[in-house]
């Protein structure tokens, strides 16, 4: 397709527009790539794009449940998960506040949308959830985004979590915290941050 055809297709389909927005030059004609990006920027309608992405988000949240604290959450599609973090990035890209080559959380600090600590927390949450998804795919041997109970213990171990005893001040063992419980606690903390950033 020509740059013009890519932009026309993107205007008609928000999924294609999102893909073009995320595109990075890897090989081929840098001039054609730059032309496509420039043409998309000329016709972009950030408010309409964001409304479309928010409508997608509402459908996704309805499908996967409104609570981010599902016992077997989807690390890509559930509330606060990767797609919600992507929405923040896409909004920044569409508003021309960052490029594909910049870390959007740093651009959010530069634009005074986040302070440095919020940006650092967002970056850590994004990295954690992305790591969860990559480990899950590796363990499953295929694309799998659901943190099913059967995956939670091996996933916790793969990510370095271990069972440990919690003791009282006198040294008496109170209970044993499982690796999967500690892992899921950290997962829920990461997605909670994603939801807070969207508010």
Describe these PLM feature segments.
Residues 1-199:
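A nucleotide- and high-energy phosphate-metabolite-utilizing enzyme signature
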